[in-house]
From Swiss-Prot:
It comes from Pseudoalteromonas atlantica (strain T6c / ATCC BAA-1087). Mg(2+) 1 binds at D269, E282. This is D-alanine--D-alanine ligase. One of its GO terms (biological process) is peptidoglycan biosynthetic process. It comes from the Bacteria.
Amino acid sequence: MTLANATHTSAIDIARFGKVAVMFGGRSAEREVSLRSGQAVLSALISAGVNAHGFDPAESELHQLVEQKFDRVLIMLHGRGGEDGSLQGALQQMNMPYTGTGVLGSALCMDKIRSKQVWQSLGLPTANYEIADKRDFNAANCSDIMSRLGDLVMVKPAQEGSSIGMAKVSNAQQLAAAIQQAFEYDDKVLLEQFIQGSEYTVSLLNGEAMPSISMSTPRDFYDYEAKYQSNTTEYFCPSGLPAEQEGLLARLALDAFDAVAGSGWGRVDFMQDMLGQFYLLEANTVPGMTEKSLVPLAAKQAGLSFEQLSLAVLATAG
Protein backbone atom coordinates (compact mmCIF):
# COMPACT_ATOMS: atom_id res chain seq x y z
CA MET A 1 0.00 0.00 0.00
CA THR A 2 1.56 3.31 -1.12
CA LEU A 3 1.23 6.58 0.78
CA ALA A 4 -1.29 7.75 -1.81
CA ASN A 5 -3.37 4.58 -1.50
CA ALA A 6 -3.22 4.69 2.30
CA THR A 7 -5.24 7.91 2.30
CA HIS A 8 -8.16 6.13 0.62
CA THR A 9 -9.33 3.87 3.42
CA SER A 10 -12.69 3.36 1.72
CA ALA A 11 -10.86 1.29 -0.90
CA ILE A 12 -9.43 -1.08 1.74
CA ASP A 13 -11.16 -4.43 2.16
CA ILE A 14 -11.21 -4.56 5.96
CA ALA A 15 -12.64 -8.08 5.96
CA ARG A 16 -9.55 -9.48 4.23
CA PHE A 17 -7.48 -8.87 7.37
CA GLY A 18 -9.53 -11.45 9.26
CA LYS A 19 -8.93 -11.75 13.00
CA VAL A 20 -5.93 -9.62 13.95
CA ALA A 21 -3.71 -9.89 17.02
CA VAL A 22 -2.11 -6.57 17.95
CA MET A 23 0.91 -7.79 19.87
CA PHE A 24 2.22 -5.43 22.54
CA GLY A 25 3.72 -5.41 26.03
CA GLY A 26 6.25 -8.22 26.21
CA ARG A 27 9.14 -8.48 28.65
CA SER A 28 11.70 -6.03 27.28
CA ALA A 29 12.89 -2.83 28.92
CA GLU A 30 10.56 -1.00 26.52
CA ARG A 31 7.41 -2.71 27.79
CA GLU A 32 5.68 0.48 28.94
CA VAL A 33 6.20 2.23 25.61
CA SER A 34 5.02 -0.89 23.78
CA LEU A 35 1.82 -1.00 25.83
CA ARG A 36 1.05 2.59 24.89
CA SER A 37 1.86 2.04 21.22
CA GLY A 38 -0.15 -1.16 21.01
CA GLN A 39 -3.21 0.18 22.77
CA ALA A 40 -3.28 3.24 20.49
CA VAL A 41 -3.05 1.09 17.35
CA LEU A 42 -5.60 -1.41 18.68
CA SER A 43 -8.12 1.37 19.30
CA ALA A 44 -7.54 2.78 15.81
CA LEU A 45 -8.04 -0.59 14.12
CA ILE A 46 -11.21 -1.33 16.07
CA SER A 47 -12.50 2.12 15.12
CA ALA A 48 -11.81 1.28 11.47
CA GLY A 49 -13.87 -1.89 11.75
CA VAL A 50 -11.03 -4.42 12.00
CA ASN A 51 -11.63 -7.53 14.11
CA ALA A 52 -8.59 -6.71 16.25
CA HIS A 53 -7.63 -7.95 19.72
CA GLY A 54 -4.75 -7.20 22.07
CA PHE A 55 -2.20 -9.95 22.70
CA ASP A 56 0.57 -9.65 25.29
CA PRO A 57 3.20 -12.42 24.95
CA ALA A 58 4.20 -11.80 28.56
CA GLU A 59 0.76 -13.09 29.55
CA SER A 60 -0.16 -15.49 26.73
CA GLU A 61 1.79 -18.24 24.94
CA LEU A 62 2.28 -17.84 21.19
CA HIS A 63 0.49 -21.12 20.42
CA GLN A 64 -2.72 -19.40 21.54
CA LEU A 65 -2.58 -17.39 18.30
CA VAL A 66 -3.43 -20.60 16.45
CA GLU A 67 -5.83 -21.90 19.08
CA GLN A 68 -7.74 -18.60 19.05
CA LYS A 69 -7.77 -18.65 15.23
CA PHE A 70 -5.96 -15.41 14.53
CA ASP A 71 -5.23 -14.71 10.86
CA ARG A 72 -2.34 -12.26 11.21
CA VAL A 73 -0.27 -10.33 13.74
CA LEU A 74 0.45 -6.63 13.92
CA ILE A 75 3.69 -6.37 15.90
CA MET A 76 3.87 -3.46 18.34
CA LEU A 77 6.52 -5.00 20.58
CA HIS A 78 9.55 -2.76 21.04
CA GLY A 79 12.99 -4.07 21.94
CA ARG A 80 14.12 -7.62 22.68
CA GLY A 81 11.68 -10.37 21.89
CA GLY A 82 9.79 -8.13 19.50
CA GLU A 83 12.23 -6.36 17.20
CA ASP A 84 15.21 -8.71 17.26
CA GLY A 85 13.97 -11.39 14.87
CA SER A 86 13.09 -14.03 17.46
CA LEU A 87 9.35 -13.32 17.35
CA GLN A 88 9.43 -13.01 13.57
CA GLY A 89 11.08 -16.43 13.32
CA ALA A 90 8.52 -18.02 15.62
CA LEU A 91 5.60 -16.55 13.67
CA GLN A 92 7.17 -17.68 10.42
CA GLN A 93 7.38 -21.24 11.71
CA MET A 94 3.69 -20.99 12.60
CA ASN A 95 2.84 -19.75 9.08
CA MET A 96 1.35 -16.68 10.74
CA PRO A 97 1.58 -13.49 8.63
CA TYR A 98 3.07 -10.54 10.53
CA THR A 99 3.75 -6.88 9.88
CA GLY A 100 7.01 -5.22 8.99
CA THR A 101 10.55 -6.50 8.65
CA GLY A 102 11.49 -10.19 8.57
CA VAL A 103 13.91 -12.24 10.65
CA LEU A 104 17.22 -11.09 9.15
CA GLY A 105 16.37 -7.39 8.98
CA SER A 106 14.92 -7.37 12.49
CA ALA A 107 18.07 -8.94 13.92
CA LEU A 108 20.36 -6.55 12.04
CA CYS A 109 18.42 -3.39 12.91
CA MET A 110 18.17 -4.36 16.58
CA ASP A 111 21.95 -4.61 16.77
CA LYS A 112 23.40 -1.10 16.47
CA ILE A 113 26.90 -2.47 15.95
CA ARG A 114 25.99 -4.90 13.16
CA SER A 115 23.88 -2.34 11.33
CA LYS A 116 26.71 0.21 11.45
CA GLN A 117 29.11 -2.41 10.11
CA VAL A 118 26.78 -3.09 7.17
CA TRP A 119 26.38 0.62 6.41
CA GLN A 120 30.10 1.19 6.69
CA SER A 121 30.83 -1.67 4.29
CA LEU A 122 28.52 -0.07 1.71
CA GLY A 123 30.01 3.39 2.07
CA LEU A 124 26.97 4.87 3.80
CA PRO A 125 27.85 7.67 6.24
CA THR A 126 27.98 6.78 9.92
CA ALA A 127 29.97 8.21 12.82
CA ASN A 128 33.30 6.73 13.94
CA TYR A 129 32.88 4.13 16.66
CA GLU A 130 34.49 1.46 18.81
CA ILE A 131 33.08 -1.54 20.63
CA ALA A 132 33.30 -2.38 24.34
CA ASP A 133 32.91 -6.08 25.13
CA LYS A 134 32.01 -7.10 28.68
CA ARG A 135 34.30 -10.15 28.46
CA ASP A 136 37.52 -8.17 28.09
CA PHE A 137 36.70 -4.54 28.91
CA ASN A 138 39.50 -2.67 30.66
CA ALA A 139 38.65 0.76 32.09
CA ALA A 140 42.31 1.73 31.76
CA ASN A 141 41.76 1.99 28.00
CA CYS A 142 39.12 4.71 28.29
CA SER A 143 41.57 7.61 27.93
CA ASP A 144 42.81 6.18 24.64
CA ILE A 145 39.24 5.64 23.44
CA MET A 146 38.38 9.27 24.19
CA SER A 147 41.44 10.48 22.31
CA ARG A 148 40.45 8.43 19.25
CA LEU A 149 36.74 9.30 19.22
CA GLY A 150 36.91 12.94 20.29
CA ASP A 151 35.80 15.19 23.11
CA LEU A 152 32.27 13.78 23.34
CA VAL A 153 31.26 10.13 23.05
CA MET A 154 27.85 8.46 23.01
CA VAL A 155 27.62 5.17 24.92
CA LYS A 156 24.87 2.82 23.72
CA PRO A 157 23.97 -0.77 24.62
CA ALA A 158 24.13 -2.63 21.32
CA GLN A 159 20.58 -3.99 21.49
CA GLU A 160 18.37 -1.58 23.41
CA GLY A 161 15.92 0.99 22.09
CA SER A 162 14.22 4.16 23.33
CA SER A 163 17.67 5.46 24.39
CA ILE A 164 17.61 3.08 27.38
CA GLY A 165 21.06 2.71 28.96
CA MET A 166 22.55 5.47 26.82
CA ALA A 167 24.87 8.22 28.04
CA LYS A 168 26.85 11.14 26.65
CA VAL A 169 30.31 11.49 28.19
CA SER A 170 33.18 13.96 28.00
CA ASN A 171 36.05 12.28 29.86
CA ALA A 172 37.57 8.86 30.54
CA GLN A 173 36.10 8.54 34.03
CA GLN A 174 32.58 9.21 32.77
CA LEU A 175 33.15 6.82 29.87
CA ALA A 176 34.17 3.95 32.17
CA ALA A 177 31.13 4.49 34.39
CA ALA A 178 28.75 4.76 31.42
CA ILE A 179 30.11 1.57 29.87
CA GLN A 180 29.62 -0.32 33.13
CA GLN A 181 26.04 0.96 33.32
CA ALA A 182 25.41 -0.03 29.69
CA PHE A 183 26.73 -3.53 30.45
CA GLU A 184 23.66 -3.97 32.67
CA TYR A 185 21.63 -4.04 29.44
CA ASP A 186 23.99 -5.73 26.99
CA ASP A 187 27.32 -7.55 26.88
CA LYS A 188 28.40 -5.39 23.94
CA VAL A 189 28.34 -1.61 23.95
CA LEU A 190 28.68 0.83 21.07
CA LEU A 191 31.00 3.78 21.70
CA GLU A 192 30.22 6.39 19.08
CA GLN A 193 31.75 9.74 18.21
CA PHE A 194 29.20 12.41 19.15
CA ILE A 195 28.09 14.45 16.15
CA GLN A 196 27.47 18.06 17.13
CA GLY A 197 24.52 19.37 15.16
CA SER A 198 20.86 18.67 14.45
CA GLU A 199 18.94 15.40 14.78
CA TYR A 200 16.52 14.21 12.11
CA THR A 201 14.37 11.18 11.53
CA VAL A 202 12.71 9.81 8.40
CA SER A 203 9.69 7.52 8.59
CA LEU A 204 9.24 4.92 5.85
CA LEU A 205 6.20 3.09 4.51
CA ASN A 206 6.41 0.51 1.72
CA GLY A 207 9.47 1.95 0.05
CA GLU A 208 8.42 5.58 0.36
CA ALA A 209 9.82 8.24 2.67
CA MET A 210 7.55 10.57 4.61
CA PRO A 211 8.54 14.17 5.41
CA SER A 212 11.53 14.35 7.73
CA ILE A 213 11.23 15.53 11.33
CA SER A 214 13.77 17.54 13.28
CA MET A 215 13.92 17.34 17.07
CA SER A 216 15.06 19.88 19.63
CA THR A 217 15.49 19.24 23.35
CA PRO A 218 17.07 21.29 26.15
CA ARG A 219 18.34 18.02 27.61
CA ASP A 220 21.88 16.76 27.04
CA PHE A 221 20.65 14.57 24.19
CA TYR A 222 17.43 13.00 22.89
CA ASP A 223 17.13 10.48 25.74
CA TYR A 224 14.23 8.43 27.14
CA GLU A 225 12.85 11.36 29.13
CA ALA A 226 13.05 13.70 26.13
CA LYS A 227 11.23 11.11 24.00
CA TYR A 228 8.43 10.09 26.32
CA GLN A 229 8.18 12.30 29.40
CA SER A 230 9.37 15.83 28.73
CA ASN A 231 7.06 18.63 27.63
CA THR A 232 10.01 20.74 26.47
CA THR A 233 11.01 18.54 23.51
CA GLU A 234 10.05 20.20 20.23
CA TYR A 235 9.31 18.46 16.93
CA PHE A 236 9.28 20.16 13.56
CA CYS A 237 7.56 18.54 10.58
CA PRO A 238 8.29 19.53 7.92
CA SER A 239 11.79 19.85 9.31
CA GLY A 240 12.72 22.97 7.38
CA LEU A 241 15.44 21.34 5.29
CA PRO A 242 15.88 22.74 1.77
CA ALA A 243 14.25 20.55 -0.89
CA GLU A 244 17.59 19.20 -2.13
CA GLN A 245 18.66 18.10 1.36
CA GLU A 246 15.20 16.68 2.07
CA GLY A 247 15.51 14.54 -1.04
CA LEU A 248 19.03 13.46 -0.09
CA LEU A 249 17.90 12.48 3.41
CA ALA A 250 14.94 10.50 2.05
CA ARG A 251 17.18 8.60 -0.38
CA LEU A 252 19.73 7.90 2.34
CA ALA A 253 17.00 6.61 4.68
CA LEU A 254 15.64 4.27 2.01
CA ASP A 255 19.12 3.01 1.08
CA ALA A 256 20.06 2.45 4.73
CA PHE A 257 16.82 0.59 5.49
CA ASP A 258 17.22 -1.58 2.41
CA ALA A 259 20.85 -2.34 3.29
CA VAL A 260 19.84 -3.93 6.59
CA ALA A 261 16.93 -5.82 5.00
CA GLY A 262 14.24 -3.56 6.43
CA SER A 263 10.79 -3.81 4.84
CA GLY A 264 7.19 -2.72 5.22
CA TRP A 265 7.55 0.23 7.53
CA GLY A 266 10.12 1.73 9.85
CA ARG A 267 12.15 4.78 10.77
CA VAL A 268 15.76 5.82 10.27
CA ASP A 269 17.50 8.33 12.55
CA PHE A 270 20.27 10.76 11.61
CA MET A 271 22.54 13.49 12.86
CA GLN A 272 23.61 16.40 10.66
CA ASP A 273 26.91 18.02 11.58
CA MET A 274 27.70 21.73 11.44
CA LEU A 275 28.97 21.34 7.85
CA GLY A 276 25.70 19.81 6.65
CA GLN A 277 26.89 16.19 6.43
CA PHE A 278 24.33 13.55 7.45
CA TYR A 279 25.32 10.54 9.57
CA LEU A 280 23.23 7.42 10.12
CA LEU A 281 22.43 6.61 13.74
CA GLU A 282 20.10 3.62 13.65
CA ALA A 283 17.14 1.98 11.92
CA ASN A 284 13.96 1.07 13.78
CA THR A 285 11.75 -1.75 12.51
CA VAL A 286 8.91 -1.27 15.03
CA PRO A 287 8.89 2.48 15.78
CA GLY A 288 6.77 3.93 18.54
CA MET A 289 3.11 4.72 17.88
CA THR A 290 2.34 6.69 21.04
CA GLU A 291 0.93 10.20 21.26
CA LYS A 292 4.52 11.50 21.34
CA SER A 293 5.84 9.23 18.58
CA LEU A 294 7.42 10.40 15.36
CA VAL A 295 5.94 8.16 12.66
CA PRO A 296 2.35 9.36 13.31
CA LEU A 297 3.59 12.97 13.13
CA ALA A 298 5.28 12.38 9.77
CA ALA A 299 2.26 10.46 8.50
CA LYS A 300 -0.02 13.35 9.42
CA GLN A 301 2.17 15.71 7.40
CA ALA A 302 1.94 13.22 4.50
CA GLY A 303 -1.87 13.32 4.73
CA LEU A 304 -2.54 10.15 6.75
CA SER A 305 -4.64 10.04 9.89
CA PHE A 306 -3.57 7.75 12.72
CA GLU A 307 -6.29 5.30 11.69
CA GLN A 308 -5.09 5.29 8.07
CA LEU A 309 -1.50 4.81 9.22
CA SER A 310 -2.48 1.89 11.44
CA LEU A 311 -4.31 0.23 8.55
CA ALA A 312 -1.31 0.78 6.28
CA VAL A 313 0.98 -0.86 8.83
CA LEU A 314 -1.44 -3.78 9.16
CA ALA A 315 -1.45 -4.15 5.37
CA THR A 316 2.31 -4.89 5.44
CA ALA A 317 1.51 -8.33 6.90
CA GLY A 318 1.99 -10.91 4.14
